[in-house]
Amino acid sequence: MTLEPFVLPVAGTTVAGLRSTPTAGTRVLALHGWLDNAASFVPLAMALPGLDLVAIDLPGHGHSSHMPPGTQYNTPGAICHVLEVADALGWERFTLLGHSMGAGIASLTAAAAPERVERLIAIEALGGLRGAEDETAQRLREHVRAVRALPSKKLRVFSDLAAPVRARMMANQLSEPCARLLVERGVMPVEGGYSWCSDQRLMLPTAM
């Protein structure tokens, strides 16, 4: 099964992703991990014929819209976004497939809207992150400093695709072909080469 690019208007934003040829098969909405994109599911899709598989770039990732200035990425917002995507697809009930952060969002979406989610498939699920209580104030200070410094932060520019491919291979223990899949969908052309197209706000330290 091959996946083709698509773009979907959702609640005033653009949701991009990859989709199999729509069939009468099981409807599956796939959610990728942190700083990944819909291409995460390309190798898996080859082993899943007969599904109506939609893999989206979550907000701020891949080719999807970034959140508006002055807003931040959070879990409740991600849950609402998943349901809005399903609404835009015309899917009343569907299966959720998630990897890492996407698996965490999928599991919480299933808990928040069990009447919509038929099945939940979680790969390397990532739960909520929690630090020591006595570090709360320090984490908040670090988050605020990072937010205020963000406008002056320069994008990292790669002269070619080889460097970001190597970076993904080292960071995630990926093969070269799998790392290249993610990189080709996860970078944008800029002056001097390429830069990550993911929203820099996704890299902010956790506030609480």
Which functions belong to the PLM regions below?
Residues 1-28, 49-52, 91-92, 127:
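Alpha/beta-hydrolase fold catalytic core
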Residues 18-66:
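Conserved HGGG/HGGXW glycine-rich cap/lid loop of the alpha/beta-hydrolase fold
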Residues 48, 109-113:
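Aromatic pocket-lining residues of Rossmann-like dinucleotide-binding sites
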Residues 111, 118-157:
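Flexible "cap/lid" loop of the alpha/beta hydrolase fold
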